[in-house]
Each structure stands twice: as C-alpha cells, then as structure tokens.
A protein has these predicted regions:
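A short, conserved, highly charged catalytic patch centered on acidic carboxylates
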Residues: 1-107, 116-118, 122-185
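A short glycine-rich, hydrophobically flanked beta-strand micro-motif that places a catalytic Asp/Glu
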Residues: 110
Length: 185
C-alpha cells in the first residue's frame, strides 16, 4: 500500500488548514493527535510532511517525513515515521533519516504502524523501547534528547548515509506504481 490521494480534503489537526486526504493521512492525523493530546507535546512544536532533501550523483531528490518534533530552540529532536509493514523493518531507515534531517541530526526517531512502535536512538542505532507506550511524553522527550545530542555529520558520513537512505527509499521505486518513490527535484 502506498500514499495516494482519495480525492477529498480534510482539516489538518496541526495547522487547521484544508489538506488533501490520502491513504495515510488519517494515520498521520491520529499520530499528531496522540502526541499532543496524550503525550503533552505543544502543537506548535510539531510539523508534518517535512522533507529530507539530498542528491545522488548530482540528481536532487526529496522525501517527506511524516512528523518532525522540534524542541523550544527549534532543533529537531524526534522524527516520527509511519510504516505500513513490520515496524522492525523500518528501524534503520528511520535512524538514518533522523541523522540526515536538516538542522539536526535529530537524536531520536519513532517508527509506528499505529498499533506498535519503536523508539530509536538515532546516533546509536539501537531500539530504546517498543510498543505504543515507548513514545515519550514531552518532558521525557526533551530530557532524552538532551542526553543524546548528536554531533553534526562530516561530509563523508553524510554522503554514506545519503546513499543508505536513498537505497531504502529506492525500494519504493517500482514497488507498486510510478508515484510510490522519493521525488526528484
């Protein structure tokens, strides 16, 4: 299953704006609602569909991340990625995405299918906790992020991680249709 338009719109929970309803948008909305209403995240610290932009052999690509959580200093501290398969299959991809995210690296990532989740130490690559209760509350998130401040990537590290990230993204190429891929340009 991939994200496609359902031909209707809905009101975005975070921005209040009318947005395109897609096959994944209800999940993204539910995740945002969970973070704000159950975990205490300030709504203005969450941004949906934030792009990771990168180049492969001089060709630009970008890939959206479902939700990015920013600390009070506007640094990314948590990337939240929805997955339509086994959460464990997406852990490495999410860790790499967190390390590549602009303004980061973000120290933490969550991968979830909305019934299960894995909280990841992006720099260390390990799973810190599993299950939906693994998603930390706001204050806990800030403490965890402060303990895991990641160093900026060197050019060589970034190049290597971009290749890894693109390889994961490349699995989307031709998997089900032409639209299911990272976007060029």
């Amino acid at each position: 299953m991939h994200e496609t338009s359902l031909g209707t719109t809905l009101t975005d929970y975070l921005s209040g704006e009318s947005i395109d309803e897609t096959t994944y948008e209800s999940f993204r909305q539910a995740l945002a609602r969970l973070l704000v209403e159950e975990r205490g995240y300030p709504k203005d610290r969450l941004k949906a569909k934030q792009d990771i932009c990168y180049e492969i052999d001089g060709e630009p690509f970008h890939r959206p991340i479902d939700i990015v959580v920013y600390d009070p200093d506007n640094r990314p501290v948590l990337l939240v990625m929805f997955c339509s398969g086994s959460v464990g299959s997406y852990e490495r991809e999410a860790s790499v995405a967190a390390r590549l995210f602009p303004g980061g690296p973000a120290p933490l990532a969550v991968v979830t299918d909305t019934t299960s989740a894995a909280l990841l130490d992006a720099a260390g690559g390990g799973v810190l906790a599993e299950g939906m209760n693994a998603i930390p509350r706001w204050r806990q998130l800030l403490e965890m992020a402060a303990e895991r401040r990641a160093e900026p990537l060197t050019e060589e590290q970034r190049d290597r991680l971009v290749r890894i990230f693109h390889t994961y993204s490349g699995f989307l190429f031709g998997a089900c249709c032409q639209d299911c891929r990272p976007t060029r340009g």
